[in-house]
Each structure stands twice: as structure tokens, then as C-alpha cells.
């Protein structure tokens, strides 16, 4: 529908335009006319598809979420995958529901992704009018809105170009790779390969805006730590006469991975480590007495099952620090918004463990959520990406994991790329 306001005093006549319907204007009256364009839809010039694994927004979504998760061969390799994964999901759903009940009855990840997307699109319209209008879309892997439904919405909106924007700063085949693989496969299944022109933001672990936003949150947490330390009046000398109780250890916590995935060459651990190093290089917080930077460690959370995963576990690190009389600031380094890993695992389970082990003070650095710094970082990422004449993905995008033997994966390709590059 195209609306045009025509305010004029003209002779009564009927006119016709090839792309418009017949319209009649009356004599000597100010007339407002809505003219239907039946041949053209208003276009969304740039769609921003925000990719994430998702999370159940309501308790009744928990079991379907777990079923999609445990039947995904890119995440878990199970015998008789569909049957076994469905059975595991059914058995775990009640326990997982209780975790979501404790954080408000569902994951806030959709809420935060919507908020980030709205702010991002609005900012993009201002800083990049030539690629406007921009509209964000959400494509979750295991919960609504699923990618298949979002593609239908984009088709209905007449989107021209889409940036597939991973909400995981560090690339892993189990997160970004799985989402992209599902995206390209779904396009093929729906015979929509030629509907949109695509490009990909597949990793951004070293982006300055992301690093700066993380540093900002750590500094805020450090100030909170010192304030709470004064309130608690904690003695700053431990049992070994080490003057270190008032110096927190920075515990960077990221979602873990099975070692079987890591040993295939998944780049996630090295990219998380790169983020940590860049944050520490720019943090600038130093001990007032020694002038040295704060001590830090990278740990891993959310292990599932009995098989080996990345270590040390975040819970193990907290236990050991507590035994040594140390305190900690925990920093979620691979998440851009709050969800069950921050609100339940860190804020509830890890805090309980810290108290049980005798740790006097554990503070969590806030998630990025809708902080203006992370929105600006995302806008800079997308804007730079759109302005590039050559780059439609990262330099590392086409490099498959050395141990990957699955020739059916699409995760290192791009369906109908925006530019005619050799893929």
C-alpha cells in the first residue's frame, strides 16, 4: 500500500498511472487520496538476521527446546540420535523447568535480542541512510522464532539484502556454525535460495567496541566489589599472611565445549582466549600497592554429561580460590545478554557454591544486554560490513575444522551471496 496525500484545488477529473489504481478528485475541495499500488510492496532494503541458539521464553517451551537441542548432531553425537535425544529431553525437562522457574519462568534471551535489534536498526537508519530502511529479525536454532518462520516473514516484508549476524562473538561449529548450517539448509528446503542476497558476520571476538563494552562492565563490577568489600570489612590478610584478600581474581567464564569438538579444531577456545587477552590489555586496572594488573583466569561452565569438556570448570576455580582465601569477579565473556547461564548458573549456583566454600565475596560483571556501548559496537560492525566492497564474511570463514568429516554441512558456504566472489 502506497499512501500519497494530495491537497489541491483542481478541476474534477479521473486519472490513471500504470502502477496506480484509478482515482477521482473532486472540484474545489481539499482532498486526501490513498492510492493503492498493487504491483509493488514497500521494500526493506537491509534485513539484519540475529542468529542465536535461543531459549524457552515460557515453561511449556522447555521440552521442545531441549528436544531440538539434544537431537542436533552438530551439538551432541548420540546413538539413534532422534530417539535418544528425545528421551533425554523428556527426562531432563522437569529439572530444567525448575531452573527457569527460579529466574522468572523463562529465558529473557528473546526479550534482550529484540531490544538489541530494535536499537541496532534504529541506529543503522541514522548512520547509514543509503542502506536504510533496516529491520532486525531473530532466527533462533531451538526456540521461537525459528529460522524457517523468520525466512517467511522476511519474504513477506520484501527484504532485499540480509546480513546473517551471529550473536556469538567467538565462532564455534556448535553455535554460529550450527545456526548458519541450519539457515542455508532451510533456504534450500524452502526453495528460497534466490529470495535474498546474503552476507555474514560470523565472528567479532576482537572488535574494539565489544572489548570496550566488556571493559566498561568489568570496571563497574570492580567498583561494586570494592564497595561491598568495605561494607563487609574483610581482613585483607589471609592465613598465609598474603596481603591479597582485597584483590579480586578476574574469572572469565565462557560456555564449555566437549573435547571431542575441540580436538577436531574448533576455533572457539582460541577466539575466547583472544577476547580475554584484548580485554586485559585494555582494562588498565592496577593494584594500588604493587602497580601490577589484576590476576585473571579463563574458565568454562555449562558442562553436560560424563565425557571430557574444556577445563578448568568455573565451579572448580571458585572452589580453589575460596580455599586460598581469595575473592572473585566472574565475567561472562562469551554471552552478549542474560540467560540461564548467567542468571542461574552464576547468580544462583555459583554464588551458593562460593558461600559453601567460604568465599567472602563473589561479584558478577553485568551482561551487556542493551548497554549503549554494545549497541554502538553492533552498529559499527554492521555498518563497516555493509560499507565493505569486498568482505562478505571473515577471513577465517571458509576454513573448515581439520577433523571435520561431515561433507553435508553448509556452515562454511553462503547461499546467494551479495557479491560475485569465489566461494
Swiss-Prot record:
Residues 1-29 form a transit peptide. It holds the Pfam family Ferrochelatase. It is an enzyme of class 4 (lyase). Keywords: 2Fe-2S, Heme biosynthesis, Iron, Iron-sulfur, Lyase, Membrane, Metal-binding, Mitochondrion, Mitochondrion inner membrane, Porphyrin biosynthesis, Transit peptide. PROSITE patterns: FERROCHELATASE. It is a peripheral membrane protein. Pathway: Porphyrin-containing compound metabolism; protoheme biosynthesis; protoheme from protoporphyrin-IX: step 1/1. Its EC number is 4.98.1.1. [2Fe-2S] cluster binds at residues 173, 401, 404, 411. Its cofactor is [2Fe-2S] cluster. One of its GO terms (biological process) is heme biosynthetic process. GO terms for cellular component: mitochondrial inner membrane; mitochondrion. One of its GO terms (molecular function) is metal ion binding. It catalyses: heme b + 2 H(+) = protoporphyrin IX + Fe(2+). It is found in: Mitochondrion inner membrane. Its main location: mitochondrion. Belongs to the ferrochelatase family. Monomer. Catalyzes the ferrous insertion into protoporphyrin IX. This is Ferrochelatase, mitochondrial. It comes from Dictyostelium discoideum (Social amoeba).
Amino acid at each position: 500500500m502506497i499512501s500519497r496525500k494530495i491537497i489541491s484545488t483542481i478541476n474534477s477529473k479521473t486519472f490513471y498511472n500504470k502502477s496506480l489504481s484509478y482515482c477521482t478528485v473532486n472540484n474545489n475541495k481539499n482532498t486526501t487520496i490513498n492510492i493503492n499500488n498493487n504491483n509493488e510492496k514497500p521494500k526493506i532494503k537491509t534485513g539484519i538476521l540475529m542468529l542465536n541458539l535461543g531459549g524457552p521464553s515460557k515453561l511449556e517451551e522447555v521440552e521442545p527446546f531441549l528436544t531440538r537441542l539434544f537431537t542436533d548432531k552438530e551439538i551432541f553425537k548420540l546413538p539413534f540420535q532422534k530417539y535418544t535425544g528425545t528421551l533425554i529431553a523428556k527426562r531432563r525437562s522437569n529439572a530444567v523447568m525448575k531452573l527457569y522457574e527460579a529466574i522468572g519462568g523463562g529465558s529473557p534471551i528473546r526479550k534482550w535480542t529484540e531490544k538489541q535489534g530494535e536499537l541496532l536498526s534504529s541506529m543503522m537508519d541514522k548512520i547509514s541512510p543509503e542502506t536504510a530502511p533496516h529491520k532486525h529479525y531473530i532466527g533462533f536454532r531451538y526456540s521461537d522464532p525459528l529460522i524457517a518462520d523468520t525466512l517467511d516473514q522476511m519474504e513477506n516484508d520484501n527484504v532485499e539484502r540480509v546480513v546473517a549476524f551471529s550473536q556469538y562473538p567467538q565462532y564455534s561449529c556448535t553455535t554460529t556454525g550450527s545456526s548458519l548450517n541450519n539457515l542455508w539448509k532451510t533456504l534450500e528446503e524452502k526453495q528460497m535460495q534466490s529470495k535474498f542476497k546474503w552476507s555474514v558476520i560470523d565472528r567479532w571476538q576482537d572488535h574494539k567496541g565489544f572489548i570496550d563494552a566488556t571493559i566498561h562492565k568489568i570496571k563497574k563490577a570492580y567498583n561494586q566489589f570494592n564497595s561491598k568489600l568495605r561494607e563487609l570489612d574483610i581482613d585483607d590478610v589471609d592465613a598465609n599472611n598474603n596481603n591479597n584478600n582485597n584483590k579480586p581474581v578476574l574469572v572469565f567464564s565462557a560456555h564449555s565445549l566437549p573435547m571431542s569438538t575441540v580436538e577436531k579444531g574448533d576455533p572457539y577456545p582460541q577466539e575466547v582466549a583472544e577476547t580475554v587477552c584484548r580485554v586485559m590489555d585494555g582494562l588498565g586496572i592496577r593494584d594500588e600497592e604493587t602497580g601490577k594488573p589484576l590476576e585473571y583466569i579463563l574458565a568454562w561452565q555449562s558442562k553436560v554429561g560424563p565425557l571430557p569438556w574444556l577445563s578448568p570448570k568455573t565451579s572448580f576455580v571458585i572452589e580453589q580460590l575460596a580455599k586460598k582465601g581469595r575473592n572473585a569477579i566472574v565475567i561472562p565473556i562469551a554471552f552478549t545478554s542474560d540467560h540461564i547461564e548467567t542468571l542461574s548458573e552464576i547468580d544462583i549456583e555459583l554464588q551458593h557454591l562460593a558461600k559453601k566454600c567460604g568465599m567472602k565475596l563473589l561479584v558478577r560483571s553485568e551482561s551487556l544486554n542493551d548497554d549503549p556501548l554494545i549497541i554502538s559496537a553492533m552498529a559499527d560492525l554492521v555498518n563497516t560490513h555493509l560499507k565493505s566492497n569486498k568482505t562478505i564474511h571473515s577471513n577465517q570463514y571458509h576454513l573448515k575444522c581439520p577433523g571435520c568429516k561431515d561433507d553435508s554441512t553448509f556452515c562454511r558456504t553462503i547461499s546467494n551471496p551479495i557479491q560475485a566472489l569465489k566461494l
